[in-house]
Amino acid sequence: MAKGIREKIKLVSSAGTGHFYTTTKNKRTMPEKLEMKKFDPVVRQHVTYKEAKIK
């Protein structure tokens, strides 16, 4: 069976709340770290989420 090219990643809130989202990304087309603005329900506002490895 073929191994998938997409890798699971965790997007961790920069607000320091410990909240995170999980998603996948294609390592071949997006080798750099992912960074995006998403809603953090703990602080109830949009903050920057940065990529981290899933342990």
Swiss-Prot record:
Keyword Ribosomal protein found: yes
Transmembrane spans: none
GO MF annotation, one: structural constituent of ribosome
SUPFAM superfamilies the UniProt entry points to: Zn-binding ribosomal proteins (SSF57829)
Lineage top rank: taxon: Bacteria
Keyword annotations from UniProtKB, A to Z: Ribonucleoprotein, Ribosomal protein
Tagged with keyword DNA repair: no
InterPro entries, per database record: Ribosomal_bL33, Ribosomal_bL33_CS, Ribosomal_bL33_sf, Ribosomal_zn-bd
PROSITE patterns: RIBOSOMAL_L33
GO cellular component, as recorded: cytosolic large ribosomal subunit
Annotated GO biological process: translation
Alphabetical list of PANTHER family matching this protein: 54S RIBOSOMAL PROTEIN L39, MITOCHONDRIAL (PTHR15238), LARGE RIBOSOMAL SUBUNIT PROTEIN BL33M (PTHR15238:SF1)
Similarity remark: Belongs to the bacterial ribosomal protein bL33 family.
Full protein name: Large ribosomal subunit protein bL33
Naturally occurring in which organism (per UniProt): Proteus mirabilis (strain HI4320)
Lineage, top ranks: Bacteria, Pseudomonadati, Pseudomonadota, Gammaproteobacteria, Enterobacterales
The gene coding this protein: rpmG
